[in-house]
């Protein structure tokens, strides 16, 4: 039986983030992107979410390499964790590789990982696959799409892209997409993020014009916060500041790191004598200073957060400061951003943000740009990716409007196995593809049971019941003593605490009278009686933790 090409998304479908796709044929396998996701509201204490790589680990001998489209966290953020389980060469463009190296250094993995630099136009042989790098525009420099030449046909994966004719690093290589379309494209996997938006994504030059307008009319200090990875935006801030005779200081760890990498690799060209050390800003007049900061998403302890809440060592918000938030809110971050904006206003600052001005443009293609890619590539099969269910469905509808056979459009899910032959492309089962939760240094040790307990604690708090029992006859020597955490304030609820102590005492007496000495049964009895009493009297269900000590 002839081998089949398998396309297996391990993340990025029916979700935003965690982008990772496996291509497998016979004894060869490659992975495109290796990103992280951010925890949902009910994932208490979880820092990051990464793809489940059980399938990769089982097939590690087949793995020929990781191919990365660009340097955003949702495409590179899981690499330090995944490479510890399945190590293989990592292929990317210079800037993307520089950002990956920063992440691997934090985990002491640089010397253990083969990092391979490529440029648009390069074709890399990886087993039976030939992976071609194609230049695209995005909100970070050095982004690429991949044309993956397989035994079944050419698979194009656009990665995150848009079409920006005025981009600093040149327009998306539409000529190459068109040439591939003429040669024949088997399948197109295309970015669906902005499929709900009509028209074209505005150019980055729109933001530059808006920033210039605000700089021109401002007589006070300017603080600009944006995504640290948006090098075109940062370059624009430096250029505009220089034009208006202002110095620029930078604050925020990720901003410092990316500035260093991008400057070393010649992706950022800072005007001479414009960059100043943050410790020098007090000696610079307000109308001659710009501060570029992290914190555009309201992240706790980011530079802008620390400024807003007066915990930044070098920068204190002053009345009249102009703060420009040059970024749009990622879904879920709106409350955090609003909180910071309100705090900045409270300190007398003027805050200018995207809802009021054209201070941000997306890095993803809108409908007309998507239509261009579909028209140029003319794929036999189409698989919408990089989006939630509504995005995938809308993108499928757009493909149908472009005249594509509905039978050749596949709506897959994370974990779906897409089997491809020269004539057919169909869904054929699933592989493990859950969410691995990262909490501090723990990877995968927080599961549904732990999350359920954390949710329980967050909602109703906890009661600890401490009791000392005699090792001779099981009688109560002292206690029960109660400790409340997150349930009620004990001093204000003494009657309730006394009643709870009586219930626990009664539970212990019942067990003693029945000659029950098994600790598990005693604990279960205390928990059951207290839970029933508390729900009846308070309509709340705190976690109850009996602690028995034997003396």
Where do the model's predicted regions map?
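Conserved hydrophobic residues forming the short capping helix/wall of the S-adenosyl-L-methionine
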Residues: 104, 399, 534
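C-terminal tails and terminal domains of large nucleic-acid-associated
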Residues: 515-551
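A glycine- and charged-residue-rich anion-binding loop/surface
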Residues: 13, 37-41, 62-63, 353-356, ...
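Short glycine-rich phosphate-binding loop at a beta-alpha junction
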Residues: 89, 383, 545
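Short Gly/Ser/Thr- and Asp/Glu-enriched loop/turn motifs at secondary-structure junctions
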Residues: 119, 413, 540-544
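Hard-cation-handling environments
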Residues: 196-326, 330-499, 503-515, 523
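His/Asp/Glu-rich metal-coordinating catalytic cores
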Residues: 2-67, 72-283, 302-316, 335-339
């Amino acid at each position: 039986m002839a081998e089949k090409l398998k396309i297996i998304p391990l993340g990025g479908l029916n979700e935003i983030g965690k982008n990772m796709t496996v291509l497998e044929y016979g004894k060869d396998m490659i992975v495109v992107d290796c990103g992280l996701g951010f925890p949902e509201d009910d994932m208490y204490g979880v820092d990051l979410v990464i793809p489940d790589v059980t399938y990769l680990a089982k097939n590690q001998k087949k793995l020929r390499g990781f191919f990365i489209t660009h340097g955003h966290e949702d495409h590179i953020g899981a690499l330090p964790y995944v490479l510890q389980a399945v190590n293989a060469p990592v292929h990317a463009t210079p800037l993307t590789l520089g950002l990956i190296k920063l992440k691997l250094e934090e985990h002491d993995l640089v010397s253990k990982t083969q990092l391979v630099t490529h440029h648009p136009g390069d074709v890399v042989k990886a087993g039976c696959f030939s992976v071609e790098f194609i230049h695209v525009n995005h909100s970070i420099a050095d982004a690429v799409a991949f044309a993956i030449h397989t035994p079944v046909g050419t698979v194009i994966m656009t990665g995150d892209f848009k079409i920006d004719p005025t981009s600093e690093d040149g327009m998306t290589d539409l000529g190459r997409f068109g040439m591939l379309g003429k040669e024949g494209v088997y399948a197109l996997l295309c970015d669906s993020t902005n499929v709900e938006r009509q028209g074209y994504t505005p150019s980055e030059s729109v933001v530059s014009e808006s920033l210039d307008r605000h700089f021109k009319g401002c007589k006070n200090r300017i603080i600009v916060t944006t995504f640290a990875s948006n090098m075109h935006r940062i370059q624009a801030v430096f250029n505009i500041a220089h034009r208006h005779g202002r110095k620029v200081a930078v604050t925020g760890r990720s901003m410092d790191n990316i500035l260093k990498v991008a400057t070393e690799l010649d992706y950022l060209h800072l005007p001479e004598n414009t960059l100043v050390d943050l410790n020098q800003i007090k000696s610079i007049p307000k109308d001659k200073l710009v501060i570029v900061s992290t914190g555009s998403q309201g992240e706790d302890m980011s530079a802008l957060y620390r400024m807003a809440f007066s915990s930044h060592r070098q920068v204190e918000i002053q009345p009249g400061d102009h703060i420009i938030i040059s970024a749009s809110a990622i879904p879920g971050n709106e409350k955090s951003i609003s909180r910071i904006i309100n705090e900045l206003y409270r300190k007398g600052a003027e805050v200018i943000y995207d809802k009021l001005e054209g201070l941000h443009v997306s890095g993803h293609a809108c409908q007309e740009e998507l239509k261009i890619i579909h028209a140029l590539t003319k794929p036999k099969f189409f698989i919408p990716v990089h989006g939630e269910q509504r995005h995938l469905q809308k993108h499928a509808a757009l493909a149908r409007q472009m005249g594509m056979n509905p039978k050749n459009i596949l709506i897959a899910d994370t974990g779906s196995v897409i089997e491809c032959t020269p004539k057919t492309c169909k869904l054929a089962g699933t592989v493990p593809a859950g969410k691995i939760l990262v909490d501090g240094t723990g990877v995968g040790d927080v599961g549904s049971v732990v999350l359920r307990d954390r949710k329980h604690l967050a909602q109703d708090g906890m009661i600890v019941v401490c009791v000392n029992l005699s090792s001779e006859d099981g009688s109560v020597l002292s206690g029960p003593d109660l400790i409340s955490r997150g349930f009620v304030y004990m001093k204000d609820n003494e009657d309730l605490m006394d009643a709870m102590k009586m219930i626990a005492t009664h539970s212990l007496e019942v067990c003693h009278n029945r000659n029950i000495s098994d600790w598990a049964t005693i604990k279960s009895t205390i928990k059951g009686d207290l839970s029933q009493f508390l729900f009846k009297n308070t309509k709340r269900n705190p976690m109850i933790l009996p602690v028995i000590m034997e003396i």
